[in-house]
Amino acid sequence: LVDVAVKSNANCIKFQTHITEKEMIKSNITPGNISKKTLWSIIKNCELSEKEERKLQQYCKLKKITFLSTPFSIEAVDRLKEIKMPAYKIGSGELTNVPFLEHIAKTRKPVILSTGMSELSEIKSAVKLFKKFKIPLAILQTTSIYPANYSDINLGVIEKYYDIFDV
């Protein structure tokens, strides 16, 4: 995947950092029509060990492409901090997790904030938190439907975000 990104002239590649035991309670919940496997087993199967993640980050460095990852727990933030990740990408499902957001803000690293599953009031609260800590911030209009229909993409909200948040 890294090699394909480099070949495509990407300057950054983003992964996800899951430490399943720290981000969810083990249960038999299945994600509807996507899979018959439990959500726990799907996430656990996608999890990279700390050693694997360090190896991936080092490979990105060798290939001169920026390594980023979306953490899903405070422990994942700490792991990424140890490998000196330059910024944090936050998934829209985490915008209401204030202790998590504050933990990221305390790293003093720039933040890329997804908004797909969030209400405007939730986005405003998260932006206010990062501005309080004077964290460089990028706000992404994202659509949390895969694949997304063109009618659901709502690119017009980007201008609204620009006006509201002055970013």
Regions found by a protein language model. Give the residues of each.
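Catalytic cores and adjacent flexible loops of soluble metabolic enzymes
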Residues: 1-167
